[in-house]
Amino acid sequence: MNSKLEIAKLEPVWNTNKSIFYLMSSIVFLLFALPLFNVNSFYLHLMITIFMYSAMSQSWNVIAGMSGQISLGHGAFFGLGAYSSTFLYMEYDITPWAGIVVGIFLSGIVAILIGLSVLRLSGHYFAIATLLIGISFQVIFQRWDLVGAASGLWVPLTEFDSWNAMQFHSSKVPYYYIFLVFFLITFFLIWLLDRSKIGFRFRAVRDDPQAAASLGINVSKHKIIAYAISAMIMAPMGSLFAQYILIIDPDRVFSFDISIFVLLLTVLGGVGNIWGPLVGTVILIPVTEYSRIWFGGTGGAVDLMIYGIILMIICVFRPAGIISLVPARILERDKKR
């Protein structure tokens, strides 16, 4: 662990595998070019959903994969982001772009306050505490008349497409680019965090808290920082989701299902690896969307059965996730100057 901390001090953050860099640059170029090929709205919606859940899974991976704390109530920050931007736009005509920023800071503050009380717990106790916190947020918003209680909030519709109001009625393409940019920003920030000194300290705390403390790392402080960063990444996805569907309610945006699904995506792809959440999302989101087409409604629970089968196979044969199928040397940073 000490050697890891030394590496974090000596190696440039920007040092990365050149092959991975060229591959990712090509993929990003293709993603930006995709709408130019007149892709139908379903595939745009599919990509939007992938971008959103990839960013959400990266958020959960910070607290679980980097710092080793399993959160079962992470959907609370998704809901806070959704309600922050929507409420400010409805009541004060504040653009959702500003509402996103408010949601990010609000989620960060709430995460710090929660962290001060529950991050002294660990293992199952922390997981149960976060589960109860997530449920508490849902119950509070169901009974809070100021934010619509159980009925939720409807985003006021604009007559025409508006970037200021983040509403586009004629096409999903603007939404596609907005979600894509936010996803890329999220991935880039996580990529930097993963290679930074604080990222190595997170992993030191995860691997051996006592040894980390003996090296001068404030364990509680770094757990709280990881929790706050994780929450601040989750919040803007809630804000964007609210603008995309134009209606939110506590059962939709504070749902326990959100927390579990994000956990599932990350575990499937590979916890603790920045590529894991992306891999898990790219595999499972199409399963969800196509099962709804083939079986109607919510997919007739077929998608849940498929998730269960895939998860059991992964847990038995690849406990480190699907990303472990990729040779480690391909994902390592290129240390050659």
Residue positions per predicted region:
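Transmembrane alpha-helices and adjacent helix-loop boundaries
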Residues: M1-R337
